Amino acid sequence: MDGFRCDVASFVPVEFWLQARAAVAAVNPDCVWLAETVHRSYGCLARRHGVYSASDGEVFRAFDLEYEYDVREVFDQYLRGEVPLSRYLDALSFQEACYPANYNKLRFLENHDQPRIASFVRDVRALVHDTAMLYFLKGTTLLYAGQGFENDHL
């Protein structure tokens, strides 16, 4: 096993993840831990209703990389043409200020929880440019199955 992708990791106490990671490290110290965190607004909503929701900064204590859901809402607004790219870049700058220096975010245009990018960004050049941009951002790039073929359905 190379690693674990932990679904909605923000809603599980970080102390559990730290214990799980230590137990796995005793067997495989090179195991990679990927946290699917939650959109910032969803984490805030959960907290307002008394539901535990760890911040991305807290989750990084136990994980090697996280989905970029903390800035995903702004990125989606950019993809829909609602805000300029500079707004998303400002959000990325915020990540630089609030996470550990070695933080690693999983950058993506689509995944199993998101609509296919080609279903709403119809300009092929824009798809190519947005995909290329991911490779120049700090973090790890995810190309979801079929994205390279401009699939517009699940």
Where on the chain are the PLM-derived regions?
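Short, acidic/polar
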Residues: 1, 125-131
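Loop/turn elements at helix/coil->beta-strand transitions in domains of secreted/extracellular proteins
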Residues: 1-3, 28-32, 138-142
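Substrate-binding cleft of secreted/luminal carbohydrate-active enzymes
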Residues: 131-152
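Short catalytic-loop micro-motif centered on adjacent basic/acidic residues
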Residues: 3-9, 117-118
